[in-house]
């Protein structure tokens, strides 16, 4: 089977998803061509189709924002990563974002109309697809991560010097309001100088966090990222909307407990009380309380980390994701 994954470069976890999906398909003995178009086509996707002809394939797979632009006689699989039109997220969107998302809504609607199959990264997104777009036939395929790369180990390299007496938190991803980055300084102020938060800027610079106990590591390479996951004590994500939570799954795979928001897809990853704690959305005090509870109990952190590693290997690997997509592909070419 020949698969082409074609989409506009997103500068986010969507690009990681595309790369992991392509690698998984190849490992399963099929051909896969990965074609990421320039981000400029995000605003006008159609010219991306003519820029470079799609190789002859059995399946074309793309994300919902761009997929309609690549439709031809080949079966088209469309993946919805997260529904930005979710009413629960509306209070956090800026006026420019709302205008841009109106355009994206039209693009997504076209993609679903021409799709031969639609997949979602989590059950929450599948429900929102039904509510917002009236699309009721989506397949659930959880995103997979490389559990052999993201694994527990004792780092030998030192990307950043960390004082031994501090409890180290880690936030990975773009520093956006959707990810709850604006809450990080407030949470760290509550926690005080006994805690240190390491953040990455992801592939987009995002918000500037001015706080003495927050260190921005910038964009990290994969080996550095795995090191930081393993050097932290707790992974923190006060996100307001996730279609899956790639960095959460990576931290879990490295055997770390997670403190996350009880919203969108996050309860599908983090089992409250077993793999970490889920907090009320935007509740800085709740986040600080849960973090302090974990910081004071090393055995609990270890137990939750072991639970999370096992959970990832059972549910969120590249191979399991690949098997899900291959099932969808095979239904279309029988």
Roles of regions detected by a PLM:
Residues 124, 144:
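Carbohydrate-associated surface elements
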Residues 286, 293, 300-315, 321-327:
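A short, well-ordered alpha-helix in the C-terminal region of glycosyltransferases
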Residues 98-118:
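Membrane-proximal helix-turn-helix segments that form the acceptor-binding/catalytic region
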Residues 240:
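Aromatic "clamp/platform" in nucleotide-sugar-dependent glycosyltransferases that forms part
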Residues 161-179, 185-189:
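Conserved donor-binding/catalytic core segment of Leloir-type glycosyltransferases
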Residues 219, 272-273, 277-284, 293-298:
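Conserved acidic donor-binding segment of nucleotide-sugar-dependent glycosyltransferases
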Residues 220, 227-232:
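Short alpha-helical donor nucleotide-sugar binding micro-motif in glycosyltransferases
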Residues 257-260:
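Short hydrophobic beta-strand element within catalytic cores of glycosyltransferases
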């Amino acid at each position: 089977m020949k698969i082409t994954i074609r989409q506009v470069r997103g500068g986010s976890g969507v690009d990681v998803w595309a790369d992991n999906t392509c690698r998984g398909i190849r490992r399963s003995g099929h051909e896969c061509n990965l074609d990421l178009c320039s981000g400029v086509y995000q605003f006008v996707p159609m010219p991306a189709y003519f820029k470079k002809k799609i190789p002859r394939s059995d399946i074309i797979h793309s994300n919902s924002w761009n997929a309609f632009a690549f439709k031809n006689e080949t079966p088209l699989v469309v993946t919805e990563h997260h529904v930005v039109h979710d009413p629960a997220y509306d209070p956090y969107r800026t006026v420019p974002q709302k205008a841009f998302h109106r355009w994206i809504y039209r693009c997504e609607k076209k993609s679903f109309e021409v799709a031969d199959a639609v997949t979602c990264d989590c059950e929450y997104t599948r429900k929102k697809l039904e509510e917002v777009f009236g699309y009721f036939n989506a397949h659930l395929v959880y995103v997979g991560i490389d559990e052999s790369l993201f694994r527990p180990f004792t780092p030998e390299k030192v990307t950043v010097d960390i004082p031994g007496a501090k409890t180290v938190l880690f936030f990975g991803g773009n520093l956006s309001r959707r990810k709850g980055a604006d809450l990080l300084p407030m949470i760290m102020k509550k926690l005080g100088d006994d805690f240190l938060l390491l953040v990455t800027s992801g592939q987009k610079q995002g918000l500037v966090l001015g706080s003495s106990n927050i260190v921005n590591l910038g964009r990290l390479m994969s080996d550095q990222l795995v090191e930081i996951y393993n050097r932290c004590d707790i992974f923190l994500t006060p996100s307001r909307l996730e279609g899956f939570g790639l960095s959460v799954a990576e931290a879990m795979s490295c055997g770390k407990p997670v403190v996350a928001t009880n919203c969108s897809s996050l309860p599908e990853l983090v089992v409250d009380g077993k793999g970490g704690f889920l907090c009320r959305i935007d509740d800085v005090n709740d986040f600080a309380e849960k973090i302090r509870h974990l910081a004071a109990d090393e055995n609990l952190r270890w137990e939750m980390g072991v639970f999370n590693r096992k959970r990832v290997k059972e549910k969120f690997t590249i191979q399991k994701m690949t098997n899900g997509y291959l099932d969808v592909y095979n239904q279309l070419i029988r």
